[in-house]
């Protein structure tokens, strides 16, 4: 069979862009996008994306050029996930909650040629552009009015080249979109959140995004024509690749500019939402919403981004949400590990089910392999649920590498074929992975490795605590000790004291894991996707000095 080799008919490049054309054929008259009073069908979305792609190409945007977008979860943001790569360009969705200085650095680093800007981010982008180096080329700006309002190109300032509507109106609906020459061609550029360090440019190819999109649908068991609520920002790892996934299954995208628990519950009731995604902070918001009542119909919710406390999972599911839990990174374009549920677990007590579901799980069906290894030797750690190691993985959705950072790429993607995530975890005897911390968040107290996540889980079980995060505080004797930052629920008649919270932890944790310090905050600092920015809290803890300077050295 040596003569049987790949041929053009069997090696068409894998790309998720074809999902849109199929959606227009199969689900043409079905609703694709809803945003306030605005709605489109899949035929209309397909036509709009072709017009937009043709206009982008007519501006001199070539294969490999970066096109950026600064916008929330509005219809234009959804359309650009197709239109930009359909023009042969690389989509760069920018976190709109970043400050102007950081945005300026990212845009300059990416050499972005064109930037689509939501009308509420006008001042932000102009400030960012003003911070460009003097000799640096400035990208052209496209103004995006809110489609639910009467905004048009007359609102444009001289800084903007044209409006989004202009590009749609003058585009060619018969445009032949640019098929990648190779499935390995770059399609997406995302920057990491910067929760632990400076953001890095992560490049994904058409093949990787295709694999992640299909994998996400299979693993979550997404049916045809779901109603999907956009609570997860599309600028965060491209919404875990669900923009393309919703086209593949002909779903309805319910777009939201912003949300809170009241808006979410209203959207669920109004549109019959079946699916949504969000970080554990969204689950915490929903489960603590004033006057929340159990849902009349089940809503599937996928959570990831941080290890969810089992207490939060328990409260959320008691309201009628069916929670699925996964794990992924910007570098994997979405979730590559999920807590695959076993039927026999249904018969366990609710608290035990929540504990099992809080584990990250096993590799998804299209993820080649995951493991937990000793970061020094590279050997797999014991599958005992307690031996810590670094989480490593390999698979088709892992990034091509970091933009303009060969050293960083080589450090994380080693010669032995593994991608080193920087996350610390354990492997349980049943083969399920559990994330314990980021490597920078592990607390080493008296020579013991201490998981901040385990302490946080206990804090979240306290009836008065809304949010909790634990970091290391310097200690002259122990090296480091746990320092807890908490925010309390609203409307408490009696607020717990630091001593009471410490006593609560002492009743449920080994002595060395009990926080020596509890700091009360109105709200914890978070990224736009709900991840607590622990580097800010670590700086605060360091500023407190030693926890036991001149004090008792005994373990609590």
From Swiss-Prot:
Region called SBD1, residue ranges: 260-325
Family in the record: Belongs to the ATP-dependent AMP-binding enzyme family.
Name the record gives this protein: 2-methylpropanoate--CoA ligase CCL4
InterPro entries per record: AMP-bd_C (IPR025110), AMP-bd_C_sf (IPR045851), AMP-binding_CS (IPR020845), AMP-dep_synth/lig_dom (IPR000873), ANL_N_sf (IPR042099)
Organism: Humulus lupulus
Protein origin, superkingdom: Eukaryota
Tissues where the protein occurs: Mostly expressed in old leaves and in cones and glandular trichomes (lupulin glands) after flowering, and, to a lower extent, in stems, young leaves and flowers.
GO molecular function: 2-methylbutanoate-CoA ligase activity; ATP binding; CoA-ligase activity; medium-chain fatty acid-CoA ligase activity; propionate-CoA ligase activity
Gene: CCL4
Location within or outside the cell: Cytoplasm, Cytosol
